[in-house]
UniProtKB/Swiss-Prot annotation:
It comes from the Bacteria. NAD(+) binds at residues 3-14. Gene3D superfamilies: N-(1-d-carboxylethyl)-l-norvaline Dehydrogenase, domain 2, NAD(P)-binding Rossmann-like Domain. The gene is mtlD. This is Mannitol-1-phosphate 5-dehydrogenase. Signal peptide: none annotated. The keyword Oxidoreductase applies. Keywords: NAD, Oxidoreductase. GO terms for biological process: mannitol catabolic process. One of its GO terms (molecular function) is mannitol-1-phosphate 5-dehydrogenase activity. It catalyses: D-mannitol 1-phosphate + NAD(+) = beta-D-fructose 6-phosphate + NADH + H(+). It comes from Salmonella enteritidis PT4 (strain P125109).
């Protein structure tokens, strides 16, 4: 089996690329970073530091690399069995034209074997969004063939991969946590379902997408925002602060009550899942900076994201949300000289006040009780 993976960054090498290579799949990375491409093609291997209770160093070998903006990547698409991505949500649109060219070439060469494409991004239904970009880039005469022969498979991914500690070290070395989860929608594949250790197949993807969003992402963000306010540097430092931990755990329990009501998750198993995530936040080997985790607060306060979406669920089912509201208030206080969204958020609050600003960002009714609760919490943490 041959696979092409877009994105040779830390997540690509440390998570999805590693799983594919470990499964014995012939893997080629596509990226724009020439330093990384040259290193991969010189060595055809790299090391992954897996950190946790049992630290180990794994070697990933037998890999190649091509530029994601050249003809080589188009040629590869015509012949591979699987395409995956870990490029970041905003970059999906940029790689779509190359994928479209490769699919057109595949059709022209009469390669009718099924091809499956899986976007492994921190977003909901990312592959469906990628499909839209690819379809827009295709000629009308190629679209029906693509619908017939190419599966666009949505997925949910979960593994903490912090940025490299130093810019001067080996460009291929990467550190990841022990935990990883890659859940894919088995109803969207073309051809036989793949057997890749570490890939979990489901016919109820949205339950797992929201479980991750409402638990890991919600908890991670609130830990970062409360941690920044309290002067902590890392997620570990913040979650070891008992006052922060109580709010984070409470928020995950509130969002968990929504998941249990909506999808029928087992309450005891979900409580264990929350405990596992708190343990991941405590990992002393992951130097996860609160400022990095907190960046892009406007996106994280939007209606479909990790803070407002679970809150809307509590309103839908008439469930408590006091800790989620505290997390939202902390997010409104997030300031960072390195993050344009943090600066935009601050300017919006200065211009319109917290009530109107939150309503504009989140889509919540400015006159609702829950916005009043958030504004009270915001003012209480000044």
């Amino acid at each position: 089996m041959k696979a092409l993976h877009f994105g040779a960054g830390n997540i690509g090498r440390g998570f999805i690329g590693k799983l594919l290579a470990d499964a014995g799949i012939q893997l080629t990375f596509a990226d724009v970073n020439q330093v990384v491409l040259d290193a991969l093609n010189a060595r055809h291997s790299y090391q992954v530091h897996v950190v946790g209770e049992n630290e180990q160093v794994d070697t990933v070998s037998g890999v190649n690399a091509v530029s994601s903006i050249g003809d080589d990547v188009v040629d590869l698409i015509a012949h591979v069995d699987l395409i995956t991505t870990a490029v970041g949500p905003v970059v999906l649109e940029r790689i779509a034209p190359a994928i479209a060219k490769g699919l057109a070439k595949r059709k022209a060469q009469g390669v009718d074997a099924p091809l499956n494409i899986i976007a492994c991004e921190n977003m909901v239904r990312g592959t469906t969004q990628l499909k839209g970009h690819v379809m827009n880039a295709l000629a009308d005469g190629d679209k029906a063939w693509v619908e017939q022969h190419v599966g666009f498979v949505d997925s949910a991914v979960d593994r903490i991969v912090p940025p490299s500690a130093s810019a001067t070290h080996d460009p291929l070395e990467v550190t990841v946590e022990t935990f990883s989860e890659w859940i894919v929608d088995k109803t969207q594949f073309k051809g036989a379902l793949p057997n890749i250790p570490g890939m979990e197949l489901t016919d109820n993807l949205m339950a797992f997408v929201e479980r991750k969003l409402f638990t890991l992402n919600t908890g991670h963000a609130i830990t970062a925002y409360l941690g920044k306010l309290a002067g902590h540097q890392t997620i570990r430092d913040a979650i070891l602060d008992e006052s922060i931990r109580a709010v984070v755990k409470g928020a995950m329990e509130e969002s968990g009550a929504v998941l249990i009501k909506r999808y029928g998750f087992d309450a005891d198993k979900h409580a264990a899942y929350i405990q596992k995530i708190l343990g991941r936040f405590e990992n002393p080997y992951l130097k996860d900076d609160v400022e990095r985790v907190g960046r892009q607060p406007l996106r994280k306060l939007s209606a479909g994201d990790r803070l407002i979406k679970p809150l809307l669920g509590t309103l839908e089912y008439g469930l408590p949300h006091v800790n989620l509201v505290k997390g939202i208030a902390a997010a409104m206080h997030f300031r960072s000289d390195e993050d344009p969204q943090a600066q935009e958020l601050a300017a919006l609050i200065t211009e319109k006040g917290p009530q109107a600003a939150l309503a504009q960002i989140s889509g919540l009714d400015a006159n609702s009780d829950v916005v009043a609760e958030a504004v009270n919490a915001y003012n209480a943490t000044k």
